[in-house]
Amino acid sequence: MRLIKRFFKSVGVLLLLQVAAVNAELNDKEAALKAGFLFNFARYSDWQVAATPVGYFKLCSPDSDFLDTASWVLHQQTIHGLGIKVALVELDSLNINQCNLLFVTHRYREQWVTTDKSLLLHTMLVGETPDFIKLGGHIRFFLASGKIRFEVAPESLKKADIVMSSKVLRLSRIVKEGEQ
């Protein structure tokens, strides 16, 4: 009897590990897709004023798990002739003013609320929480029918001196600044 219980416990643990592995794989896949979107957002946008000219395009996030995937996906890619540097930043740090693009995952929503947005005047701001654009962001990812979609606040981008291609805007849901 004990042997049967132990067997079923082992099977249960294996099933839980398999479910966890599938969830981790889905999260990695979603992060990889979002990194690809970020690459294309940057590729099809023009910065009228560089955030801080440093000789490379700096993609930042406070989420190290996302950055691990983004580093792999964006390895040896370029944006406007510049190599991409993926950088971990803290949202309360002055270093965020050196980012060309900042991606804020849902885990960092509370820090985003208190972030000094004046440090991000010429930075493309992308997030994934429902109120991200209302809280000062430019682009927000959301899921619809199991697919990653995005919405853009073009007027907010314009205030940051960033012009996004109309081709990308046609693929997005357009929102007005402060709306969601």
Question: Model features per residue range: what roles?
Answer:
Residues 2-9, 22-180:
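Short hydrophobic alpha-helices and adjacent helix-cap/hinge residues
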Residues 17-21:
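N-terminal signal peptide c-region/cleavage motif recognized by signal peptidases
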